[in-house]
Amino acid sequence: MATLKDQLIHNLLKEEQTPQNKITVVGVGAVGMACAISILMKDLADELALVDVIEDKLKGEMMDLQHGSLFLRTPKIVSGKDYNVTANSKLVIITAGARQQEGESRLNLVQRNVNIFKFIIPNVVKYSPNCKLLIVSNPVDILTYVAWKISGFPKNRVIGSGCNLDSARFRYLMGERLGVHPSSCHGWVLGEHGDSSVPVWSGMNVAGVSLKTLHPDLGTDKDKEQWKEVHKQVVESAYEVIKLKGYTSWAIGLSVADLAESIMKNLRRVHPVSTMIKGLYGIKDDVFLSVPCILGQNGISDLVKVTLTSEEEARLKKSADTLWGIQKELQF
């Protein structure tokens, strides 16, 4: 007896189902799921895989997304504790790990998360040896280094979300002050994602008009308008949101989808992301810090050489020294 499906549909070919634009998100906490929904709403993948160790939560999140399939254009959403569900991914986004507690610095999380990465990274590499790795877990600069070391991948394929969000926060606050949309407010926050990030005041502009030229005291202590406060707010913003709602999720999710778009569509847009910076700005150790990078299908293909003041360069170097101090003690 022919089934209803057989009566309705005449099959023409047996297809082998290898996804062309598969994205995996490892970790289905608040950040992982914000990344997932942001990616789904930008139609970046033909298959989305979710991985976590908590199986009930994982299955629930997968089902909840699948139930929205009518409103999405990602035909396949899968999940599993076993990394075989991640096979053939173009991009693997790591959000798993211990989360920052209220008042805890990102650097404090480090050894807890290194131990988690020792399990995750080899499994990702086993099933998607040609993928790009996008690291989001904190402290992101150190964990991007850890992922690079464990994976054995070339440095262009290991990317930290880095200061992409810090710069977005900076541009939002700049826009609020000026009454201009953030996309027309240009400004870069570089270096460590977190407390020692470096705002590049000389590069701040709207429509190519340098703010520093109009207002030479910009970013200095003698600035009557206290623009330094804008960067201070960027640094404090995550702590404030964590204090208020317990974690951050939406902005980092959107920021990660922005990076994923540049990679999946080979856009070659410039983003402040964490990359191996050894040999630049007098840095001699294997550290990852955010500088403006060109992002495309091979990950980071090039970086932009930003002209920094001696003070900015010194701050970058100090970040590098701090990170290396922690990295050289790590056990993995």
Swiss-Prot record:
Keywords: Acetylation, Cytoplasm, Isopeptide bond, NAD, Oxidoreductase, Phosphoprotein, Ubl conjugation
Residues bearing the modification N-acetylalanine: A2
CDD domains linked: LDH_1
Catalytic activity entry: (S)-lactate + NAD(+) = pyruvate + NADH + H(+)
Keyword field contains Oxidoreductase: yes
N6-acetyllysine, modified sites: K5, K14, K57, K81, K118, K126, K224, K232, K243, K318
The organism's place on the tree of life at top rank: Eukaryota
Residue positions, PTM Phosphotyrosine: Y239
PROSITE patterns on file: L_LDH
Position of the Glycyl lysine isopeptide (Lys-Gly) (interchain with G-Cter in SUMO2) cross-link: K57
Coiled coil: none
Any one GO BP annotation for this protein: lactate metabolic process
Residues binding NAD(+): 29-57, 99
Pfam families linked to this entry: Ldh_1_C, Ldh_1_N
GO molecular function, one term: L-lactate dehydrogenase activity
InterPro entries attached to this UniProt entry: L-lactate/malate_DH, L-lactate_DH, L-lactate_DH_AS, Lactate/malate_DH_C, Lactate/malate_DH_N, Lactate_DH/Glyco_Ohase_4_C, NAD(P)-bd_dom_sf
Keyword Acetylation: yes
Binding site for substrate: R106, N138, R169, T248
EC number in record: 1.1.1.27
Complex and partners: Homotetramer. Interacts with PTEN upstream reading frame protein MP31.
Function: Interconverts simultaneously and stereospecifically pyruvate and lactate with concomitant interconversion of NADH and NAD(+).
Protein name: L-lactate dehydrogenase A chain
Lineage start: Eukaryota, Metazoa, Chordata, Craniata, Vertebrata
